[in-house]
């Protein structure tokens, strides 16, 4: 179970389904489902109660006669709706011997109902351009869809159907259990997960169910795997209207939306709620210590103190304390541990839980610092809280950060709905009404009292990760991969083909409203300042926030020879001190008002980002301008950054990679196989990167900055609650004095890479303690963003593996055969030729079979092509889901910046759907022949040896 990085996220939720962006249509469900014991129409029985609370949030609370609670909030900034159902059941409701049951049940909720065959739920959402997912937490299980607002009824029908009528077919259960095992193994690949979930929490909780992992103990999962009745009985005990909350936020009329929910959910009778006694955790009366030892490179320290549950009087003080300790570079732990070289990273805080949980400190030691020394540093900071009151400035900054977070979350319908649902599902539906008032009432004396009450040695659990050396041994041979593609036949799914065809014919929906956003979109404005800096502004006055994104043509492609990483270090140093402000002053200036600025490296450019409330937009601009125009490159900060970079490289040695994170072992080997040294997309090995990082000097960074940071290669995009003319004036005031050099910019050229004359040999990276194997297959795809067939190629890639559940790879490898939890394929088009790649995360014993199916599916697609139906469904998804990315100011800004970067035009967002819809089947088939080459790719195997 992944621990949230901040307590504002839903409590300890597990991202269970490989973040499926799934499409859907409405049909196959009957107009009304008959429950075994149906209630009379809620509209007729007079027991529907509805009222509006939290005037600032405009939330309407409705109670149906069957006990279902509905929370609805209108938000009309984008034509989308976030629809979710929160069940008040999670791993805390399980019993010993059946742990993991909630998570298995969540997986099976996607495997069909009495009316919907396996695969139909995903199919329906995908073909309607929606995103669907679910998470299992300790206290709740959460199902949610982000979809065009005119598809709200689809979400309600499907969620109501599977609340009552999920089927739990034994064959589907057998397939899905392999996927669950793969997910469990993938989690345990991470030493951090293993330390927190399998070591630290079980030590901290001896009696309460927070003792066990949300995904379950492996032995329990195996015991439940074959027992359909146990899973079904658990479903019937917990999935019922009177144990659920529906939350919907988006572009709808409240009365109509509630009527839709009443129509589909109101027909079900309330269930008999299980009287399940949760054993409370007794007071801890002595320090507990545990140690995890496994192969790895970097240690880790966790310290947890028992604290009260969410909503308890001291909970609000603990939230403030979390900000003081961990929120930003000005926070106490960063200043005391990271700035002083004890820690590579350090943070901590409390989490939202129904029952008393922990205030957790989490730190990673710097090189040559022991876990014990780092623990002493953490303890010193806790003692400081107990002996000295926090300053008025710290207290005010923490409160401003919390207030800003409340404002920022209203940028997104998803975040608004998640916060509402999280608290309603733990029976605190009005939590947000009074939260800010209670936070504002916290005093320095409260902080000191709470620290003295809870942060005591007898109340804490300490966990160390002590990495062990990797055992010596030669890499095993790669798994055999058959090459008999000629015998391949078209793939069909006998369980689904006829039913899904009938479903599509029955529904035959009009194009989702999100697929044609041109009519309602505001028009951005583009201005070029006299110094060449490009400014794009789009107004959105729905929420008093502003998002900024941008870039400077100063990426890693310009790194000097033998000093890879200069560009990244230069970008990172810009926020670590200017000629007018220290790193701490820069951080505190922004953090004191809950704003933020980021500058990071990239392959082709340095990337800029920022966010603030409207009232602080001027501060955001002036800080970014100071960092871009007047960096000081202080020597002490550079050495600190060098040490952190080296520690990060050591961390990468224990990461199998393959999931999209740059710098991990599989991605490094993959990039080295595809691109020659010196190419912008080539990546050094960890050893090479360490040597380069040690060799880079301050003079290298200053020289790079003076050469490549210039206004005429800079783009700034601003979206939010600003007036275009005012924003342009403010940007010109902040950046207009940045002089353009007389010399022209450095050439921006990404060279072509010739196709390999022979297929590279597979590469094996052995991490013996990893329970899962990551497989990365691919080649230089030959596609650029400017390629005329870019859109046809993306349709081809989507059909192959663009979705975990709706693609050919996903359906065959995960859904039908249960061989992998994570399955994906992509064809990247950049300024240069990007990679084609397929990623699989699988158990070592399934690796050879999964690879064989992958090759077979590729060969079948190349030999037989794709169907017109597949092309239509791909278009529906690719056009329908795109505007879902535009629900936030940051999302819109990112798309406008990309359109500028690739010279797509200011109207690209409005035109994008037409560009996809214009692609013909013949163009897709041609793209398959051009870009799909199953026999040419390199194979990277990382993790446990494939069997």
Predicted regions and their residues:
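M16 family metallopeptidases and their MPP-like homologs
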Residues: 73, 77-96, 100-104, 118-163, ...
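Non-catalytic, conformational "gating/processing" segments within enzyme and secreted inhibitor domains
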Residues: 177, 230-263, 459, 651, ...
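Proteolytic maturation boundary segments
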Residues: 34-71, 253-293, 300, 335, ...
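Short, glycine/charge-rich beta-strand/loop segments that flank catalytic centers
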Residues: 138-144, 171-182, 603-610, 636-647
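Short, conserved secondary-structure transition motifs
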Residues: 181-187, 280-294, 398-409, 612-613, ...
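Gram-negative bacterial Sec-dependent N-terminal signal peptides
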Residues: 2-33
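Histidine-acidic residue clusters that define the catalytic metal-binding segment
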Residues: 43-61, 201-244, 276-281, 309, ...
């Amino acid at each position: 179970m992944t621990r949230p990085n901040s307590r504002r996220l839903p409590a300890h939720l597990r991202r269970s389904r490989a973040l499926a962006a799934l499409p859907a249509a409405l049909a196959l469900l009957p107009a009304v489902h008959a429950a075994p014991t149906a209630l009379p129409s809620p509209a007729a029985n007079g027991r529907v109660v509805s009222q509006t609370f939290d005037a600032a949030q405009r939330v309407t609370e409705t109670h149906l006669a069957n006990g279902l609670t509905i929370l609805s909030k209108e938000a009309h900034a984008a034509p989308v709706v976030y629809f979710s159902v929160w069940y008040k059941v999670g791993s805390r409701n399980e019993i010993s011997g059946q742990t993991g049951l909630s998570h298995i049940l969540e997986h099976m909720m996607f495997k069909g109902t009495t009316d919907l065959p396996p695969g139909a739920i995903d199919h329906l959402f995908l073909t309607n351009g929606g995103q669907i997912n679910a998470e299992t937490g300790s206290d709740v299980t959460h199902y949610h869809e982000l979809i065009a607002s005119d598809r709200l009824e689809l979400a309600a029908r499907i969620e109501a159907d599977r609340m009552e009528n999920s089927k739990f077919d034994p064959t589907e259960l057998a397939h899905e259990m392999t996927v669950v095992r793969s997910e469990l193994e993938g989690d345990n690949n991470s030493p951090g997960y293993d330390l927190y979930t399998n070591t630290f929490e079980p030590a901290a909780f001896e009696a309460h169910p927070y003792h066990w992992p949300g995904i379950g103990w492996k032995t329990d999962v195996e015991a439940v795997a074959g027992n359909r009745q146990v899973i079904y009985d658990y479903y019937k005990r917990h999935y019922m209207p009177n144990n659920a909350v529906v939350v919907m936020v988006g572009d709808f009329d409240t009365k109509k939306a509630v009527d839709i929910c009443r129509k589909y959910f109101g027909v079900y009778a309330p269930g008999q709620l299980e009287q399940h006694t949760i054993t409370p955790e007794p007071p801890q009366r002595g320090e507990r210590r545990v140690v995890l030892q496994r192969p790895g490179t970097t240690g880790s320290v966790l310290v947890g103190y028992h604290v009260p549950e969410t909503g308890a009087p001291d909970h609000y003080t603990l939230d403030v304390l979390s900000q003081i300790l961990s929120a930003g570079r000005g926070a106490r732990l960063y200043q005391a541990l990271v700035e002083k070289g004890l820690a590579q990273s350090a943070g901590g805080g409390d989490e939202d839980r129904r029952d008393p949980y922990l205030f957790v400190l989490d730190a990673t030691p710097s090189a040559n610092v022991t876990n014990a020394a780092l623990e002493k540093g953490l303890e010193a900071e806790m003692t400081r809280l107990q002996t000295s009151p926090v300053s008025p400035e710290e207290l005010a900054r923490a409160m401003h950060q919390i207030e800003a977070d409340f404002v920022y979350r209203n940028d997104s319908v998803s975040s608004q709905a998640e916060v509402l649902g999280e608290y309603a599902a733990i029976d605190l539906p009005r939590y947000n009404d009074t939260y800010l008032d209670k936070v504002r009432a916290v005093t320095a004396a409260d902080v000191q009292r709470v620290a003295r009450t809870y942060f005591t040695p007898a109340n804490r659990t300490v966990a160390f990760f002590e990495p062990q050396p990797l055992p010596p041994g030669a890499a095993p041979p790669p798994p055999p991969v058959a090459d008999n593609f000629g015998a391949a036949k078209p793939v069909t799914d006998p369980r689904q083909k006829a039913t899904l065809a009938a479903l599509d014919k029955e529904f035959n929906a009009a194009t989702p409203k999100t697929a044609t956003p041109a009519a309602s979109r505001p028009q951005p404005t583009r201005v070029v300042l006299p110094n060449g800096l490009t400014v794009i502004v789009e107004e959105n006055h729905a929420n008093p926030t502003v998002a900024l994104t941008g870039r400077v043509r100063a990426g890693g492609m310009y790194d000097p020879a033998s000093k890879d990483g200069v560009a990244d270090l230069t970008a990172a140093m810009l926020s670590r001190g200017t000629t007018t402000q220290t790193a701490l002053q820069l951080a505190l200036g922004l953090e004191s008002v809950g704003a933020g600025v980021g500058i990071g490296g990239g392959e082709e450019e340095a990337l800029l980002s920022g966010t603030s409330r409207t009232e602080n937009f001027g501060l955001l601009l002036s800080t970014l301008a100071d960092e871009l125009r007047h960096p000081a490159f202080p020597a002490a900060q550079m050495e600190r950054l060098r040490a952190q970079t080296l520690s990060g490289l050591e961390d990468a040695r224990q990461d199998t990679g393959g999931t999209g994170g740059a710098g991990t072992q599989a991605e490094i080997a993959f990039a080295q196989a595809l691109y020659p040294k010196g190419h912008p997309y080539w990546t050094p090995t960890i050893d090479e990167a360490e040597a380069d990082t040690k060799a880079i000097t301050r003079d290298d960074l200053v020289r790079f900055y003076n050469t490549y940071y210039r206004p005429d290669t800079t783009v700034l995009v601003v979206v939010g609650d600003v007036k275009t003319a005012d924003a342009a004036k403010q940007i010109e005031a902040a950046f207009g004095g940045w002089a353009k050099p007389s010399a022209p910019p450095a050439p921006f050229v990404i060279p072509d890479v010739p196709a390999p004359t022979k297929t590279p040999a597979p590469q094996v990276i052995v991490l013996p303690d990893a329970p899962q194997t990551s497989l990365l297959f691919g080649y230089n795809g030959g596609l650029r963003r400017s390629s005329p067939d870019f859109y046809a190629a993306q349709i081809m890639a989507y059909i192959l593996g663009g979705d975990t559940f709706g693609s050919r790879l996903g359906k065959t490898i995960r859904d039908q055969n249960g061989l992998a939890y994570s399955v994906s394929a992509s064809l990247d088009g950049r300024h240069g030729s990007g990679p084609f790649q397929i990623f699989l995360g699988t158990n070592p014993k399934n690796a050879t079979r999964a690879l064989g199916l992958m090759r077979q599916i590729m060969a079948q697609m190349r030999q037989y092509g794709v169907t017109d139906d597949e092309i239509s469904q791909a278009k529906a998804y690719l056009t329908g889901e795109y505007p879902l990315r535009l629900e936030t100011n940051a999302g819109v800004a990112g798309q406008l910046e990309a359109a500028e970067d690739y010279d797509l035009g200011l109207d690209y967002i409005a035109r994008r759907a037409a560009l996809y819809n214009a692609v013909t089947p013949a163009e897709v088939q041609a793209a398959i022949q051009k870009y799909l080459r199953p026999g040419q790719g390199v194979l990277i195997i990382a993790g446990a040896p494939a069997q």
